């Protein structure tokens, strides 16, 4: 069984996750969905072309993009209540102590126990989810009425 100590975040993963915070939520869900699809080993020849959100949005037909966005949203929705509670708690205690990549990696480690394998040890997926939580903000995460992801 893997623990959060086994998770490694490459500099590229953290840089890209930090950039995602400035994107719209659908763009982040698109990237998350493509990573989830990779982990599920979905056989899709267009997946090899999904290099970045910009490439996806501008060069692939919408019917090739929407399934990945939907997959990202559905994945996050499954875990939203636990993520919201953990994110609220962790950001309340640590949000002012960290910034940028340190904030992303700290929150990613804090939420890793909420997911089954392989997602609980996949740094890129955890960093993307941490970016979504950071972008949503502490007000959204700590709102008891926020039943669905942004």
What does each model-found stretch correspond to?
Residues 2-93:
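Membrane-active, amphipathic/fusogenic segments and juxtamembrane/transmembrane anchors
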Residues 56, 124, 146-149:
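Contiguous hydrophobic segments
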Residues 2-3, 144-150:
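Short acidic DE-rich linear segments
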Residues 87-144:
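Membrane-inserting effector segments that mediate pore formation, membrane fusion
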């Amino acid at each position: 069984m893997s623990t959060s100590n086994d998770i490694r975040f490459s500099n590229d993963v953290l840089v890209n996750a930090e950039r995602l915070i400035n994107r719209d939520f659908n763009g982040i869900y698109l990237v998350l969905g493509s990573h989830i699809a990779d982990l599920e080993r979905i056989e899709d020849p267009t997946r090899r072309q999904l290099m970045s959100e910009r490439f996806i949005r501008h060069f692939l037909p919408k019917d090739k993009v929407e399934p990945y966005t939907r997959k990202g949203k559905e994945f996050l929705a499954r875990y939203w209540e636990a993520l919201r509670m953990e994110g609220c708690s962790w950001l309340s205690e640590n949000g002012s102590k960290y910034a940028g990549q340190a904030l992303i990696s700290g929150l990613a480690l804090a939420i890793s126990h909420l997911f089954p394998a392989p997602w609980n040890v996949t740094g890129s997926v955890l960093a993307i989810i941490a970016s979504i939580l950071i972008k949503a903000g502490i007000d959204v995460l700590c709102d008891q009425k926020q039943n669905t992801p942004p």
